[in-house]
């Protein structure tokens, strides 16, 4: 309730003028007065004003985070999948589950959908990362398009590169072309250790250096408590060992530009395509997710 103080209500004459109408010598005298009423509003100290509700909190109730271990009741044209790649405002989602009543259910598992993110998720500040398990709606199975309407809870999150639900991190460097830089490798290792997930160090292009240099890096990394893997995408040396380390987990391959990340993914696709679940996940982008069922 608002009250007005009688003492504060003031009536003031702003202007009092005399105006003449008519020609010279025959004017009609009219007096006009203008008044302005002003008052000072006082708040009642006994009344508590309710604060405005937080719009972000209200919107978050419309899209609560889904528990990772629970499956929502899917309706027609909905599906559950994992984000494989992200480019600008578009996400590629690998379908993992569809409604049980959906005809051709088996044919839709593993399909890749090009998706956009629901605007509400952006307004409430909910990030959507590669590796996220998501709920998609309005699926067009012909054009393979859909909309991401919600995100499941995460097990883990990597900040650089931004990716979620990772079990295993592969740090890939090359021994030459470009030559491995100890400072850059240390920075990658420190950031990886802060995540708290399993780490594998792989050194590519071992055919371009001497055996003495390979042994030198093996001794150095072992002194840092890492067991390095040496490989050559060009000669396919050590690829089997890397594939073995990628089994039954979600892995991310990171490293500087030019070390052979894309080449490694391509050779894994071509050599182990029969053992890879959802091989569409392997794309030559800045990071890669792998799903092995060996």
From Swiss-Prot:
**Which GO molecular function terms does the record list?**
GTP binding; GTPase activity
Q: Name one Pfam family in it.
A: RsgA_GTPase
Question: Which of this chain's residues are annotated to bind GTP?
Answer: 255-263
Query: Which InterPro entries does the record cross-reference, listed alphabetically?
Result: G_CP_dom (IPR030378), NA-bd_OB-fold (IPR012340), P-loop_NTPase (IPR027417), Ribosome_biogen_GTPase_RsgA (IPR004881), RsgA_GTPase_dom (IPR010914)
Q: Where is the transit peptide?
A: 1-68
GO cellular component, alphabetical, reads: mitochondrion
Q: Print the keywords alphabetically.
A: GTP-binding, Mitochondrion, Nucleotide-binding, Transit peptide
Where it sits in the cell: the answer is: Mitochondrion
Show where the CP-type G domain sits: 155-294
State the PROSITE patterns in the record: ENGC_GTPASE, G_CP
NCBIfam families hit by this protein: ribosome small subunit-dependent GTPase A
Q: Which family is this protein grouped under? A: Belongs to the TRAFAC class YlqF/YawG GTPase family.
The protein's name: Small ribosomal subunit biogenesis GTPase RsgA 2, mitochondrial
The species this protein belongs to is Arabidopsis thaliana
């Amino acid at each position: 309730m608002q009250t007005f103080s009688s003492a504060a209500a003031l009536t003031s004459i702003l202007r009092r003028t005399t105006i003449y109408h008519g020609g010279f010598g025959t004017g009609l005298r009219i007096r006009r007065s203008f008044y302005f009423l002003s008052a000072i509003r006082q708040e009642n100290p006994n009344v508590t004003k309710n604060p405005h509700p937080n719009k972000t909190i209200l919107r978050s109730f419309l899209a609560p985070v889904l528990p990772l271990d629970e499956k929502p009741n899917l309706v027609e044209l909905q599906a559950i999948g994992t984000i494989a790649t992200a480019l600008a405002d578009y996400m590629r989602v690998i379908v993992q589950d569809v409604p049980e009543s959906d005809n051709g259910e088996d044919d839709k598992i593993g399909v890749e959908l090009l998706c956009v993110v629901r605007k509400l998720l952006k307004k409430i500040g909910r990030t959507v990362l590669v590796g996220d398990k998501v709920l998609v709606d309005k699926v067009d199975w012909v054009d393979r398009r859909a909309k991401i309407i919600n995100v499941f809870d995460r097990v883990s999150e990597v900040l650089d590169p931004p990716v979620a639900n990772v079990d295993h991190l592969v740090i890939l460097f090359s021994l030459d072309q470009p030559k491995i830089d100890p400072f850059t490798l240390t920075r990658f290792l420190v950031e990886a250790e802060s995540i708290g997930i399993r780490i594998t160090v792989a050194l590519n292009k071992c055919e371009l250096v001497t055996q003495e240099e390979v042994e030198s890096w093996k001794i150095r990394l072992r002194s840092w408590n890492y067991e390095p893997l040496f490989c050559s995408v060009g000669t396919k040396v050590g690829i089997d060992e890397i594939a073995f380390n990628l089994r039954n987990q979600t892995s991310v391959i990171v490293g500087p530009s030019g070390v052979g990340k894309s080449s490694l993914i391509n050779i894994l696709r071509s050599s182990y395509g029969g053992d890879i679940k959802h091989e569409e996940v392997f794309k030559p982008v800045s990071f890669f997710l792998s799903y092995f069922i060996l």
